[in-house]
Amino acid sequence: MQEGDYEKAAEAFTKAIEENKEDAIPYINFANLLSSVNELERALAFYDKALELDSSAATAYYGAGNVYVVKEMYKEAKDMFEKALRAGMENGDLFYMLGTVLVKLEQPKLALPYLQRAVELNENDTEARFQFGMCLANEGMLDEALSQFAAVTEQDPGHADAFYNAGVTYAYKENREKALEMLDKAIDIQPDHMLALHAKKLIDPS
């Protein structure tokens, strides 16, 4: 699979299923393969079969959750990720996915602890850190948000959205000079960043 030979992988997984019909793992492996080639409904069917065989198979819940995210069925995704968590899965990707799904469901306050945990488990995950910063800003925790945006731009100096959101956060704190500095950095990186250009015009009409 890692080499991109999906046909060979499919043959191997089919053989493994035939030889171990009561083992959930080959079903999960085949579902992961189907998911990676965008066969989403079939992938879900194989995750379901795996969970029939082993209701504590955390990776099946996680895989199904990812399929639901692709299908933009966020409530179902949230349910699956929560089941993966209850089944003992503890990794940064799971916490990140659960956090982002809660953001999609407009529950940023509930997303906060999951995104925080994602960052704790993987400090180099700039996207988890950025989403954590966004949630903090939404909840009015502006200094904490700025600290996360600063860490994001340190890790990824080309992250225009982090500079933009830092600029907006400084504007809320009525620090005009710092707000403009951050917005200018966002525009330097991405000259057509419409939100940053608009925010700059609001703060500095000249």
From Swiss-Prot:
Keywords: Repeat, TPR repeat. InterPro entries: TPR-like_helical_dom_sf, TPR_rpt, Ycf3. The keyword Oxidoreductase does not apply. SMART domains: TPR. Signal peptide: none annotated. Monomer. The keyword Repeat applies. Could be an interacting mediator in the complex formation among RNA sulfuration components, RNA processing components, and aminoacyl-tRNA synthetases. TPR repeats lie at residues 1-23, 24-57, 59-91, 93-125, 127-159, 160-193. This is TPR repeat-containing protein YrrB. The gene is yrrB. Pfam families: ANAPC3, TPR_19, TPR_8.
